[in-house]
């Protein structure tokens, strides 16, 4: 059956709200290569939206899941617990850059992790308010939609959203927003909208994902830490997209001296299996009463087995170092292209969490059309890319960190061609 035939079946069988970017259908995948049902091959720089830092079907991950399949597939951890969950929590507790002694709880999706981080913060403080940032993306459930700082397409037609959520600007040199602008906005909130002692949490992404790979300045993170300490607010770092070696360190917060109280994780945690988590200061994590956290599939044993494999792969294959090496090669390609492509307004990121932003060279305004044109040129040559950003004018790069050098070089050649056409 052809891609088009599957496409017609999809239109008939599934709702339009589940938007689909590609008009081809996956047949198989290995490492950084994806093959469709017609036999066409693509270099996958989308990686299931940052889920495959260790690549498609890494042999060690497949073996770990197969071994777990022979033991049991589900018990519901809060009914019958299992050792692998506890061991994974111990590993995350030792690795995560959070304040004080740590504890970890596992869930299923990134949105679930963020929802539970807010629950934990509210239980700990007894306060309702949450401050988030414009351009941030935290999920598609109601609380996480409220936290998300972008309306289209995530919020259209779904209001009203949960209250006591407030947004402030996220720093962006390109768009003229300084760290001080962000901090001044928080202080204005305290004066005009909610008193500081009613704020449970400030949540931010150290590198905004859907927002365009904007990197939080160290001064911003330090100031958030000071504000949280001063007012008894819980500091939450959302690492759903940035975690597990993507930025050249295991977590993006490892780039900063200041530590959050809670940190959310998902996506590449289990290499394609549905697993998320919240790790944080033990005293804060213990605020909810027994039964307040959990979920039927939370910490599923197959996904937990995959996560153990992911951590081993990252260590064994030195993927943090690999992320820095590949990211520098990508940056060099983009910076060189910038000299002859006036539409390139900025190249930014950490490690292999790199993005390029496009403006109309005539008007200087953000141009989603240019980003989409380059995305389609690359796709026509077999390179799968994703756009993002508040204006849809950013291309982000999320290749598996396990991609072979020759394939990465081939992707860079396609990217150069797409930028120069």
Language-model regions, residue ranges each:
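Conserved N-terminal phosphate-binding loop of PLP-dependent enzymes in the Aspartate aminotransferase
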Residues: 1-421
């Amino acid at each position: 059956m052809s891609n088009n035939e599957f496409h017609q079946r999809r239109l008939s069988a599934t709702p339009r709200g589940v938007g689909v970017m590609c008009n081809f259908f996956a047949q198989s995948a290995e490492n950084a290569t994806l093959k469709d049902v017609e036999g066409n091959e693509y270099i996958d720089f989308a990686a299931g939206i940052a889920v495959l830092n260790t690549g498609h079907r890494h042999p060690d991950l497949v073996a770990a899941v197969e071994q777990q399949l022979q033991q049991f597939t589900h018990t519901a951890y809060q009914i019958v617990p299992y050792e692998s969950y506890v061991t994974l929590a111990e590993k995350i507790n030792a690795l995560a850059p959070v304040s004080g002694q740590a504890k970890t709880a596992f869930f299923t999706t990134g949105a679930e992790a963020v929802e539970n981080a807010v629950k934990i913060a509210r239980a700990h403080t007894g306060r309702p308010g949450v401050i988030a940032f414009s351009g941030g993306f935290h999920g598609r459930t109601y609380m996480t939609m409220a936290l998300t700082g972008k309306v289209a397409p995530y919020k259209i037609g779904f209001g009203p959203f949960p209250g006591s959520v407030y947004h402030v600007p996220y720093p962006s040199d390109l768009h003229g927003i300084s760290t001080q602008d962000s901090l001044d906005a928080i202080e204005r909130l305290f004066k005009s909208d909610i008193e500081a002692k009613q704020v449970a949490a400030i949540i931010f992404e150290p590198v905004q994902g859907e927002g365009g790979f904007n990197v939080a300045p160290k001064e911003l993170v330090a100031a958030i830490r000071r504000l949280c300490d001063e007012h008894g607010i819980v500091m939450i770092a959302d690492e759903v997209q940035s975690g597990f070696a993507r930025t050249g360190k295991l977590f993006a917060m490892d780039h900063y001296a200041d530590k959050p109280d809670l940190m959310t994780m998902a996506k590449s945690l289990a290499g394609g299996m549905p697993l998320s988590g919240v790790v944080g200061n033990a005293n804060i994590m213990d605020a909810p009463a027994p039964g307040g956290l959990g979920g039927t599939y939370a910490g599923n044993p197959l996904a937990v087995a995959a996560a153990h494999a992911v951590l081993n792969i990252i260590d064994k294959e030195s993927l943090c170092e690999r992320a820095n090496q590949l990211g520098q090669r990508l940056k060099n390609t983009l910076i060189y292209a910038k000299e002859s492509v006036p539409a390139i307004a900025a190249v930014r990121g950490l490690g292999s969490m790199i993005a390029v932003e496009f403006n109309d060279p005539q008007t200087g305004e953000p141009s989603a059309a240019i980003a989409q044109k380059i995305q389609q040129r690359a796709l026509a040559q077999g390179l799968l890319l994703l756009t993002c950003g508040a204006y849809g004018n950013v291309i982000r790069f999320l290749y598996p960190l396990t991609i072979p050098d020759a394939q990465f070089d081939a992707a860079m050649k396609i990217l150069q061609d797409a930028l120069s056409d």
